[in-house]
């Protein structure tokens, strides 16, 4: 498949984003969903038009004048366009545009079968929830957990926070979920009704969302199943996965559903993790995400949590446009002894990790949570289980400080996540140019709920975010079969302009490249401060030789806090012994961050923390720059 930007970088609600389009050699699939724009009139007019032509209708909350029409008399998926219905709408003088939605695959992630702290819970599975409090259960490593006990003891349990589970529905009648279910914030986009109950199957395949919901919001001390990470939070069901094919309208509607009621959206799904797919959000979904981080939660921004992917060493989550988005917090997983799970994908866009299973046959090494029809399970797994745990931790932080923005949450994640006893046999732990420790698979470490709520209490909103095109290489360059193509870009990060970026958050390398075998490409980028990010690692199952990457935005978080000014280096080469050919057609450097120091005004309570180290670095840099300005002033006067 192909993803890329079909237009220039667009300004949308104050953000730059890339409009991706995707092409496939397979025949397209057409659904019974239509995107309709009217010449004028509001929802009443849209309902009238829809009714006259046999459609149901929903207004799209993130786009003025656009409507979601659906026709229950049409097949949900077929190979031919419904030209009759499309033309019927287009002939109506009130209709400006009607576009039948194509379907595409989205897969659930990780659906597999497989007491030192004085926290007393009577829930029968609580002692098996090692990811909450790890005392060595199932041969785990004591102390390797989310440190929720400290957050709970400080009084934070997620009260006043709502998490939306975007999935195959949730069993909202489950006795461990019913008291925390937020019906007002829930919706079924698969059936277009307000009841997101899972569709029954003999194999209980649609238990995925219910399991995720229990990890976040299962009630405490009710003698049922286990305990949610944020057990006093509310959970909303957004049923959107259970149809033959996904559409842009359904994704966009789900991501933008009730953004003033839902604080955190948890997604344990994405493009197929087969090691050869390159895919991401379409135009409406990108628009909805941009709208969410700008306008959600009263302007503080919706918080999107994404499972990084289950393709293992055969895949790279930078080929997933959801997990690698700047607007999402991408979460990987570790097992209960700190090792990587066999299905873990690695990439430079992953921000942090939580826990799941993935190596051990012991059933108690899985994630204990709620299951369909009032049941419980010990067998939830994959990064599907990791993302809801993170959503629960973020709910605890929001209870500590409801004023946190979507970017504040990312900064808190970077600063409070810990290496703990995580172990990656492939990628070493390294420090970036400002001393922040990271790993290519685990990101900045495992979430620490206690540390996060304590820092969140005192947190001051980070400075305004700016975006700078740091430079671009547009001349085609051949990639040698052996050795590497090495290119450099020297940038001032827009210094002296309104959009100057001094302290980095996210960096994107927008790349167009073709190769005789896409899966053998390896791409690294090194910052001016010497931090190397692996933008793309080998994907042995990817045999593409025609499509390549078309303006694909590879993203890294590994240069967080660094100074973007200076020379950036891009290296492209092939892994493997077979002769190869390739051409790099474009490399554009996109810098995102702040002009002023983000941590200089923060309260430091732990002088051994990453915050203390980062603040010290900022103060020294501010002093150096002040001295330099004074010297220049003196020299100019003389």
Swiss-Prot record:
Enzyme Commission identifier(s): 3.4.21.94
Catalysis: reaction(s): Release of protein hormones and neuropeptides from their precursors, generally by hydrolysis of -Lys-Arg-|- bonds
EC top class, as a word: hydrolase
Propeptide, residue positions: 26-109
GO molecular function, a single term: serine-type endopeptidase activity
Cellular compartments annotated: Cytoplasmic vesicle, Secretory vesicle; Secreted
Tagged with keyword Secreted: yes
Disulfide bridge map: 225-376, 317-347, 468-494
InterPro entries, alphabetized: Galactose-bd-like_sf (IPR008979), Kexin/furin (IPR034182), P_dom (IPR002884), Peptidase_S8/S53_dom (IPR000209), Peptidase_S8/S53_dom_sf (IPR036852), Peptidase_S8_Asp-AS (IPR023827), Peptidase_S8_His-AS (IPR022398), Peptidase_S8_Ser-AS (IPR023828)
Domain P/Homo B, chain residue ranges per copy: 461-597
Keyword terms: Cleavage on pair of basic residues, Cytoplasmic vesicle, Disulfide bond, Glycoprotein, Hydrolase, Protease, Secreted, Serine protease, Signal, Zymogen
Listed Pfam families: P_proprotein, Peptidase_S8, S8_pro-domain
Domain Peptidase S8: residue ranges: 129-453
Positions of the catalytic residues: 167, 208, 384
Lineage top rank: taxon: Eukaryota
Signal peptide: 1-25
GO biological process: enkephalin processing; insulin processing; nervous system development; peptide hormone processing; protein autoprocessing
Glycosylation site list: 375, 514, 524
GO cellular component: extracellular space; membrane; neuron projection; nucleoplasm; secretory granule; transport vesicle
Family listed: Belongs to the peptidase S8 family. Furin subfamily.
PANTHER family assigned to the protein according to its UniProt record, in alphabetical order: NEUROENDOCRINE CONVERTASE 2, PROPROTEIN CONVERTASE SUBTILISIN/KEXIN-RELATED
Function (record text): Serine endopeptidase which is involved in the processing of hormone and other protein precursors at sites comprised of pairs of basic amino acid residues. Responsible for the release of glucagon from proglucagon in pancreatic A cells.
Protein name, as recorded: Neuroendocrine convertase 2
The organism of origin for this protein: Pongo abelii
């Amino acid at each position: 498949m192909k993803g890329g930007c079909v237009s220039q970088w667009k300004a949308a609600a104050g953000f730059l984003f890339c409009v991706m389009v995707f092409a496939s050699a397979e025949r397209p699939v057409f659904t019974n969903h239509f995107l309709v724009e009217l010449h004028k009139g509001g929802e009443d007019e849209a309902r009238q038009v829809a009714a006259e032509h046999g459609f149901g209708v929903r207004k799209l909350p993130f786009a003025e004048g656009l409507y979601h029409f659906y026709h229950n008399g049409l097949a949900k998926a077929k190979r031919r366009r419904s030209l009759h219905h499309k033309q019927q709408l287009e002939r109506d003088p009130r209709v400006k545009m009607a576009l039948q939605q194509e379907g595409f695959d989205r897969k659930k992630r990780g659906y597999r079968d497989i007491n030192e702290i004085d926290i007393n819970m009577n829930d029968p599975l609580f002692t098996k929830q090692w990811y909450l409090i790890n005392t060595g259960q199932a041969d785990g490593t004591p102390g390797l957990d989310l440190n929720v006990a400290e957050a709970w003891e400080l009084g934070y349990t997620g009260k006043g926070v709502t998490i939306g589970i975007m999935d195959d529905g949730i069993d909202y009648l489950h006795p461990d979920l019913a008291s925390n279910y937020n019906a007002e914030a829930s919706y079924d986009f698969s059936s277009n009704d307000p009841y997101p109950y899972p569709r029954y199957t003999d194999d209980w395949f649609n238990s995925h969302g219910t399991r995720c919901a229990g990890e976040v919001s299962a009630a405490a001390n009710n003698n049922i199943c286990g305990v949610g990470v944020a057990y006093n939070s509310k959970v909303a069901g957004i049923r959107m996965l259970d149809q033959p094919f996904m559409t842009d309208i359904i994704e966009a509607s789900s991501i933008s559903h009730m953004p003033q009621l839902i604080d955190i959206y948890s997604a344990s799904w994405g493009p197929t993790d087969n090691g050869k797919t390159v895919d991401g959000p379409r135009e409406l979904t990108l628009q909805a995400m941009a709208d969410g981080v700008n306008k959600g939660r009263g302007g503080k921004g919706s918080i999107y949590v994404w499972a990084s992917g289950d393709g293992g060493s055969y895949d790279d989550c930078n080929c997933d446009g959801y997990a690698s988005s700047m607007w999402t917090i991408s979460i990987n997983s570790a097992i209960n002894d700190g090792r990587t799970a066999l299905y873990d994908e690695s990439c430079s866009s992953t921000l942090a990790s939580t826990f799941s299973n993935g190596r051990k046959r012991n059933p108690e090494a899985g994630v204990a949570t709620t299951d369909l029809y009032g049941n419980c399970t010990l067998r939830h797994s994959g990064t599907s289980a990791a993302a809801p745990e993170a959503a629960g931790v973020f709910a605890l932080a929001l209870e500590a400080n409801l004023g946190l923005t979507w970017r504040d949450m990312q900064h808190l994640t970077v600063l409070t996540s810990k290496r703990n006893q995580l172990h990656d046999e492939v990628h070493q732990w390294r420090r970036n140019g400002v001393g922040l420790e990271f790993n290519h698979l685990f990101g900045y470490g495992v979430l620490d709920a206690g540390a996060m709520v304590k820092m969140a209490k005192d947190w001051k909103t980070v400075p305004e975010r700016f975006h700078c095109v740091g430079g671009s290489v547009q001349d085609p360059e051949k990639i040698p079969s052996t050795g590497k193509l090495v290119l450099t870009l020297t940038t001032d990060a827009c210094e002296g302009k309104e959009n100057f970026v001094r302290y980095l958050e996210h960096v994107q390398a927008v790349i167009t490249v073709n190769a005789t075998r896409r899966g053998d490409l390896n791409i690294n980028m090194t910052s001016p401060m010497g931090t190397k990010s692996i933008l793309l690692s080998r994907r042995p199952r990817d045999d593409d030789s025609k499509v390549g990457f078309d303006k694909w935005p590879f993203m890294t978080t590994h240069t967080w806090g660094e100074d973007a000014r200076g020379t950036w280096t891009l290296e492209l080469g092939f892994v493997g012994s077979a002769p190869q050919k390739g051409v790099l057609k474009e490399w554009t450097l996109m810098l995102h961050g702040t002009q002023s120091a983000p941590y200089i005004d923060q309260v430091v309570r732990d002088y051994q923390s990453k915050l203390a180290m980062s603040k010290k670095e900022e103060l020294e840099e501010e002093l150096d720059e002040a001295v330099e300005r004074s010297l220049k002033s003196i020299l100019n006067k003389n």
